[in-house]
From Swiss-Prot:
Binds 2 magnesium ions per subunit. The gene is dinB. One of its GO terms (biological process) is SOS response. Mg(2+) binds at residues 8, 103. Pfam families: IMS, IMS_C, IMS_HHH_1. Its EC number is 2.7.7.7. It is an enzyme of class 2 (transferase). This is DNA polymerase IV. Belongs to the DNA polymerase type-Y family. It catalyses: DNA(n) + a 2'-deoxyribonucleoside 5'-triphosphate = DNA(n+1) + diphosphate.
């Protein structure tokens, strides 16, 4: 039985700013772009979340929810530097590490002899080391597989740990709301709910063939997760060709302005994933993908060796010329990596993005 730890830093960017600026600790704080430039919230502290502020929210709307919100632009170079410091802490415990972004990673400690092989004690010690050396808190999930560990890390946030043992995993999974499953976003969740499916137990009681017919290739994934099955290994050393983020929309968007706002929302996520995969931000291309409401899609990708948000806007304009009168149901950004990048291809779907 495997022992997987998911470490997730607590409101990472905001936590760094509060650490370095104590005056921010007890006030609503967010990292993101300004409202007058159609900015988007990258993350916020827990004080701001009490007002309903969330990541990927338009800054202008966040200001309406919380007029006293303090907004700072963020310091990505510093966040990346601290992330590398945290990664070095991970390496003291295992070399089987799959970074997901600057603020979260999977660790496989199945073969570790530290703490007599106790994944729980290893996770506790990792959290201790992170706090002692960075003055930042991390939450941890411990489980026999990746997706359960990821869900568990969110159970006792902030600054908590949740352990799901092989004996308790089935009971934990079957009561989960389907929206908790990574990859199940608003669109998929609404379809599940319309079928009368709300928990993993509901999926278990549903005929498999009918379920797969309804959801296509994603059907077996939801089915497996609902049964607590996730046999994916950690991605630690294969060649990554690209990094991308995309979001499927609950409602089609129809204007260029809405597409630009979505680009602003996705860009910080892409930057975070890229910095985890390629700390020097080495790229060889940038691309934009649009999927239309007739399920046709278009991708515009050009060689570009310096990451540039403005260039994404140029690519988006080119892609929008192919739209005609169709609505847009998915927007994606991607970068191609040099062949020397010792990482693997991955696209992240943020239709279900959780607030950390």
């Amino acid at each position: 039985m495997r022992k997987i730890i998911h470490i997730d830093m607590d409101c990472y960017y905001a936590a760094v700013e509060m650490r370095d600026n104590p005056q921010y600790r007890d006030i609503p704080l967010a990292i993101g772009g300004s409202a007058d430039r159609r900015g988007v919230i990258s993350t916020c502290n827990y004080v701001a979340r009490k007002y309903g502020v969330r990541s990927a929210m338009a800054t202008a709307y966040a200001r309406k929810l919380c007029p006293d919100l303090v907004l700072v632009p963020g310091r990505m170079a510093l966040y990346s530097e601290i992330s590398q410091q945290i990664r070095k802490i991970f390496l003291r415990y295992t070399d089987k590490i799959e970074p997901l972004s600057l603020d979260e990673a999977y660790l496989d400690v199945t073969d570790s002899e530290l703490f007599s092989g106790s994944a729980t004690l290893i996770a506790q010690d990792i959290r201790r080391a992170i706090f002692e050396e960075t003055q930042l808190t991390a939450s941890a999930g411990v489980a026999p597989c990746k997706f359960v560990a990821k869900i568990a890390s969110d159970e006792n946030k902030p600054n908590g740990i949740c352990v799901i043992t092989p004996d308790t995993q089935d009971a934990f999974v079957k009561t989960l709301a389907l929206g908790k499953i990574p990859g199940v976003g608003k669109v998929t969740l609404q379809k599940l709910n319309n079928m009368g499916l709300f928990t993993c137990q509901d999926v278990r009681d549903y005929p498999l063939d009918a379920f797969v017919k309804a959801f296509g290739k994603f059907g077996p994934v939801i089915w497996d997760r609902s049964h607590g099955i996730d046999e994916r290994e950690l991605s630690v050393s294969r060649k990554r060709k690209s990094v991308g983020v995309e979001r499927t929309l609950a409602q089609d968007i129809t204007t260029d302005e809405e597409c630009l706002a979505m680009l602003e929302s996705l860009y910080p996520k892409l930057l975070s994933r890229l910095e985890a995969a390629s700390p020097k931000l080495a790229i060889q291309s940038q691309g934009v993908k649009l999927k239309f409401n007739d399920f046709q899609q278009t991708t515009v990708e050009h060689r570009h060796q310096v990451l540039d948000k403005t260039y994404f806007k140029t690519l988006l304009s080119e892609a929008l010329e192919r739209r005609g009168t169709r609505g847009i149901r998915l927007v994606g950004l991607s970068v191609g990596l040099p062949e020397t990048a010792d990482v693997q291809q991955m696209v992240f779907n943020f239709e279900h993005e959780q607030n950390r």
